């Protein structure tokens, strides 16, 4: 069962994403910030990291370096072509805009 780390500061979004992924046979861990993720988990051990772009403290793109090769999917409500391109240039494997459609998220996760 693939193990996914969700890093999202909005509890409602984090919980909804967790439920969606768990219903679809993914094992899920979660954190509210990059710092919390670093303190609680070995980030490179995850099969996928799904992170909000704008987080308290460090941006979600910091997880790209910390993941040491584990794929990182960036999601944000600040959906712009520039944000998407910048995230991908930094090494994100994909980018998804919030609010996201459940099927769209599941397809993105399955692709990775």
Question: Where do the protein language model's features map onto the residues?
Answer:
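Conserved acidic carboxylate
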Residues: 8
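Two-component/phosphorelay signaling modules centered on CheY-like receiver
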Residues: 11-29
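Short hydrophobic/Thr-rich beta-strand motif most characteristic of the beta2 strand and flanking loop
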Residues: 25-36, 40
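Acidic catalytic/metal-coordinating carboxylates
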Residues: 33, 59-62
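Active-site beta3 strand of CheY-like receiver
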Residues: 44-50, 55
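C-terminal output helix
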Residues: 80-82, 96, 100-110
